[in-house]
Design a protein with these regions (language model features):
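Metal- or metallocofactor-binding catalytic centers and their adjacent structured scaffolds
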Residues: 5, 11, 46-116
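Structured beta-strand/loop patches that form or line metal/cofactor-binding pockets in enzymes
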Residues: 5-52
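Residues that line or immediately flank small-molecule/substrate-binding pockets and catalytic motifs
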Residues: 30, 57, 166
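Short glycine/serine/proline-enriched coil/turn segments at secondary-structure junctions
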Residues: 31-35, 60-61, 141
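Short, conserved phosphate-binding/catalytic loop or strand-edge motifs used
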Residues: 124-130
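Metal-dependent enolase-superfamily TIM-barrel catalytic cores that perform enediolate-based chemistry
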Residues: 129, 135-186
Length: 186
């Protein structure tokens, strides 16, 4: 049964008035000891709702904190408006991890405010299960044999979709394998 306007309104958090929701603070929690260091972002609102995002891709909370002044007082349900305002501070560099973390936290807040799963706001449910992949970095794996061993370990854990960041150093000695400006790697 497709959602109707009334059914969506019935799911709205009665302790939240989405149009009056405002961002009041942004804080961070560092997760250490997992497979890698991870910084979680928490965006707080005037109605007690908290949205969570992750600062990723080599970014630090310092980069994400630079965005805080652009968020305070804004309605987190205006995800696209806020994203357009902060995306100039992202890109593919380290700052991008802060911008994407903010966007995830905003969607989390909007879903909580309206009482619906985020996927519902992004076009609806497409499938019941999502296949995940496991990233495998190259550090400590200087050759194909060690990388292959690491990939097999992940497969033994049940992963069926693998990603590896091989880099170019594993094939830099192979004639014709790489094309780059003369003298770049000398």
């Amino acid at each position: 049964m497709p959602d109707t306007f009334e059914s969506v309104l019935n799911n709205v958090n009665t302790h939240s008035c989405p149009s009056d929701l405002r961002i009041t603070d942004m804080r961070f929690a560092d997760i250490v000891g997992a497979p890698m260091h991870c910084t979680l972002m928490k965006i707080y609102t005037n109605q007690g709702l908290v949205g969570y995002g992750e600062v990723r891709d080599g970014a630090t909370k310092t980069y994400a904190l630079m965005l805080k002044r652009l968020l305070l007082g804004e309605n987190p349900c205006n995800v696209d408006k806020i994203f357009r305002r902060i995306k100039q501070f992202g890109g593919q560099a380290r700052q991008g991890g802060g911008v994407s973390g903010v966007e995830v936290a905003l969607w989390d807040l909007a879903g909580k405010a309206f009482g619906v799963p985020v996927y519902q706001m992004l076009g609806g449910k497409f499938r019941d299960r999502v296949r995940i992949y496991c990233d495998t970095d190259v550090s400590g794996k200087p050759d194909g044999m060690k990388m292959g061993h690491a990939l097999k370990e992940r497969m033994a854990k049940g992963y069926t979709f693998l990603k590896m960041d091989v880099g170019t150093m594993l094939i830099s000695d192979e004639p014709g394998a790489l094309s780059y400006p003369t003298g770049l790697w000398d």
